């Protein structure tokens, strides 16, 4: 049995042992009657607990089984090769080597790998390039898991030449340099540095990794959540000396295949991270509640930007965001932009009083619901709803801000959100006015958007007019609002994933004086295009494709973008063709991109 298999089996035994009762069974005779007790020691204290007669036999069997497994585990430990001297005392940072790495990586061995894992594998075992590999992205997007998977698949020979270093905020580049020299002198070849951007002097001194250690044959993998820090470094200290792998964007296809969760609604609710309750990774979803979503925005996004700017060019690169940072309002401004990212102009989001566009859209749709029109949202105290929503999201309103937010603030925050891959712009084009252009900004982590939408529903529940409705009426309104939110999010998801998956084509929304095509995919090389409507519905209705069969709209489109080779409605139902319109399941569409 190889050492790796032995270690895995030992871990399984240890888990079984932990499920069985420790200690022994003792018998006591009291007034002529025999009583049995479970005796064990915990934290240097002896404990006893009475064992009922009806469970005595099964409990004794469990005690014996634990003793047998403990003996088996003890024998296996003797089979492990003696660890080579590692001079652990010589390390000043947190370094893991040898058998500790097998234990560290054992639990992820059965996890499915992300598609980008192959790039990491190729770097470790491919031709030496004198470069470092940078694995970066927002929190909980699978970076450390990928490193552990790389360690888990190593053979024993490679593992004994590997080291994992967990960087903390107290570490320095000088201390890390000393430890790397020790590892190099002992023949270590693979070194993984996790959360390396916590080093205050990382950005200014990162050339050390490529120029000294990678150049001498060491395969170095750098990982961290401060994406901007890596981008600043790649532009200067590690220019042309690094390979970048960004983990932030997680398409529906990977969310489904890696986490094993099926359904576009689940992706809308939780998509964006590699964590979901009960599935492989963390114990609870990152976006399971408003509190978790807020914490993620503050730590994974706002802190990411602030920490990287603080460490870059000796705090001289805040540009126009310096006043916001000094007054502790940068987090608030970033949070506000993230919440209102679907607004067309970032400047308006930052300078106008906070308004819920989700609420306005839902009110319009409820009024025109053909089967059960409801105008209840017209009578809701919108000012109170807005105030409660603002409080829930902990966003400073314009009247509370002590610094003026101008175009420079808005533009710079948007630049950094783009660099983090959190936001992406989708073109909106117009016919017949071809010179009129705008953009639609989408969020790459749908779960974050949905968590904030849930806060909107909570604020609605507090409104007196809304609460006066019967339970069935309240439920109907809530479900309709969430459906509208999901519908808007589904459009963003399809547009974003199509744009990323088809770099040689142009993906955009095409608007007319009346109506629009939700998505157009234009192939410049072929001189043709495809037009789409995107619906959250599972049902088919002619109303859904009315624009696709509008002869005037189609003629204008073909004049500008060539023949229309396909007309599609992406929805949640089954594939079929109706009146020349191809209805396609949206999950299958995303799965095959």
Across the structure, where does each feature detected by a protein language model lie?
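N-terminal pre-Walker A segment at the start of P-loop NTPase domains
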Residues: 84-124
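Conserved P-loop NTPase "ATPase switch" module shared by AAA+ and STAND
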Residues: 184-206
């Amino acid at each position: 049995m190889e050492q790796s298999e032995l270690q895995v089996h030992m871990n399984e035994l240890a888990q079984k042992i932990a499920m069985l009762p420790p200690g022994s069974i003792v018998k006591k005779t009291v007034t002529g009657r025999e009583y049995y007790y479970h005796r064990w020691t915990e934290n240097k204290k002896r404990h006893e607990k009475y064992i009922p007669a009806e469970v005595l036999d099964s409990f004794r069997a469990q005690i014996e089984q634990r003793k047998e497994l403990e003996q088996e585990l003890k024998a296996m430990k003797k089979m492990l090769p003696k660890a080579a001297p590692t001079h652990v005392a010589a390390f000043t940072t947190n370094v893991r080597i040898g058998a500790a790495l097998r234990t560290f990586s054992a639990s992820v061995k059965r996890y499915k790998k992300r598609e980008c894992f192959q790039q990491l594998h190729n770097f470790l075992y491919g031709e030496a390039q004198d470069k470092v590999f940078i694995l970066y992205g927002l929190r909980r997007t699978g970076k450390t898991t990928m490193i552990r998977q790389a360690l888990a698949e190593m053979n024993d020979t490679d593992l004994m030449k590997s080291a994992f270093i967990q960087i903390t905020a107290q570490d320095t580049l000088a201390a890390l340099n000393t430890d790397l020299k020790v590892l190099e002198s002992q023949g270590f070849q693979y070194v993984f540095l996790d959360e390396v951007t916590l080093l205050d002097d990382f950005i200014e001194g990162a050339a050390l990794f490529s120029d000294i250690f990678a150049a001498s044959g060491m395969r170095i993998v750098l990982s961290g959540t401060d994406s901007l820090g890596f981008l600043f470094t790649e532009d200067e200290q590690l220019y042309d000396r690094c390979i970048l792998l960004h983990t932030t964007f997680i398409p529906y296809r990977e969310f489904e295949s890696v986490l094993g969760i099926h359904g576009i609604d689940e992706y809308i609710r939780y998509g964006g991270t590699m964590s979901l309750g009960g599935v492989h990774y963390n114990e609870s979803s990152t976006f399971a509640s408003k509190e978790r979503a807020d914490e993620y925005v503050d730590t994974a996004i706002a802190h990411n930007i602030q920490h990287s700017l603080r460490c870059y060019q000796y705090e001289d690169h805040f540009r126009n965001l310096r006043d916001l940072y000094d007054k502790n309002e940068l987090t608030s401004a970033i949070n506000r932009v993230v919440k209102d990212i679907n607004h067309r102009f970032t400047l308006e989001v930052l300078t106008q009083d906070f308004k819920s566009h989700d609420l306005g859209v839902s009110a319009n749709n409820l009024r025109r619901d053909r089967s059960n029109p409801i105008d209840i949202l017209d009578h809701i105290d919108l000012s109170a709803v807005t105030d409660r929503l603002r409080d829930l999201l902990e966003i400073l309103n314009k009247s509370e801000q002590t610094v003026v937010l101008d175009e420079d603030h808005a533009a710079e925050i948007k630049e950094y959100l783009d660099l983090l891959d959190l936001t992406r712009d989708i073109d909106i084009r117009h016919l017949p006015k071809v010179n009129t252009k705008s953009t639609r900004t989408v969020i790459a982590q749908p779960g974050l958007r949905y968590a904030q939408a849930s806060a909107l529903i909570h604020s609605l529940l507090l409104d007196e007019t809304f609460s006066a409705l019967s339970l069935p009426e309240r439920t109907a309104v809530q479900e309709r609002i969430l459906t509208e939110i999901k519908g808007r999010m589904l459009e963003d998801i399809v547009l974003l994933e199509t744009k990323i998956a088809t770099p040689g084509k142009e993906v955009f929304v095409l608007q007319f004086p009346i109506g629009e095509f939700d998505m157009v995919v234009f192939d410049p090389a072929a001189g043709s295009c495809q037009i789409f409507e995107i619906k959250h519905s599972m049902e088919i209705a002619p109303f859904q494709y009315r624009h696709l069969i509008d002869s005037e709209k189609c003629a204008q489109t073909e004049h500008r973008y060539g023949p229309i080779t396909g007309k599609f409605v992406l929805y949640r139902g089954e594939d079929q063709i109706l009146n020349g319109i191809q209805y396609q399941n949206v999950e299958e569409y995303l799965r095959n991109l």
